[in-house]
Amino acid sequence: MLGKVERSEMYILFAMTQVLLVDKISGITSHTAVAKIRHLTGVKKIGHCGTLDPAACGLLIMGCGTATRLIRYMSNLDKRYIATITLGTQTTTDDSEGEIIYSAPKPSLDKITLESIGRAAEKLSGTIKQIPSAYSAIKVSGNRAYNLARQGIIPKLNAREVRVHWKFLGDFENNQVHVQITCSSGTYVRALARDMGKFLGVGGHLSYLKRLSIGPFHLHEIYREINKKEATMSERTPSGNTQGLTDNMAISDNMAISESDKHDCTEPGINCTELGIKDTCTALREVHYTQGDTLSFTRLTALQALSRIYKPIEVSQKQADDLSCGRYISLGIDSNGPVCAVCKENLIAVIQPVSAGLWRPETVLSDNRKLNSNAAQDASGST
């Protein structure tokens, strides 16, 4: 077995790492996933973006420590899912967790073809107006919609504008259609399943959902890193024997990987090779929340995460000091939107253009002790 990682070491590791890409499995809430990561790392300040329903699985992004301030920049990114829609039954929650409130007669279902499903998808493609599911976290007069729905009160929810793109995966069999959906933030895939069933006149609900990506962050990154680590560990230890590995490697790799830890990543109609995923990927057993169940994740620094969203721009020590104090800086760059200002990885900031060449800090992550130390070194070196 690998040496045990002390909680204080784990705290330092995650406080520095800051951004996690987590593979949430079905059966737990996003809040529970955060709580388990919080318990593992000892970092109290952890937040997430893009809540997944308990029955859903896939990519969940978390920010640790000061990186929680970066979540706002990830929340509005487009998302990509694979989903299974079951036609012929409508439920109270628009997914398989709810009670069935309508079942279509068999003759009606027999008329459904992949072509008619395609026409329904066309109606639900592009920029559309969508009414969210009644069982949602949207607030209505201060109350969550799902709380009202559970009391038998059907909340009146306003339609919202969303963008949706469909891709069909395989044939229509057993009243189920498998799809890949790319959509804007705020889209309810459950509502898409409901509306497809409504358009076809047979009812429908979401029976499976997995999130593959949020903007430039992808689920397969978790397993790509794990596969790399597995290969490295195999090279270092004959016959996969992990005896004698150092605590340092325990901090890096967290846990030994065994054949029993194989995680089947194959999905119906999905070409795993195209997604960069092996047919069978090895999942690190990093967070145990019930017997035999775990969460798998990989880590990014705040800079790695933010530079995927905004163009990184190197700034001087003086400019970094100004930004950390909330002052505007001048930059000779042309951009209509925000950029990521970086100073020797001691400061990371999202800055917005004010006027030609003038930029204001919007969100700043900095270590003033390092900044001041570097500034002093620069000053002494110039005298």
From Swiss-Prot:
The active site is at 53 (nucleophile). Its EC number is 5.4.99.25. One of its GO terms (biological process) is mRNA pseudouridine synthesis. GO terms for molecular function: RNA binding; tRNA pseudouridine(55) synthase activity. CDD domains: PseudoU_synth_EcTruB (cd02573). It catalyses: uridine(55) in tRNA = pseudouridine(55) in tRNA. Belongs to the pseudouridine synthase TruB family. Type 1 subfamily. This is tRNA pseudouridine synthase B.
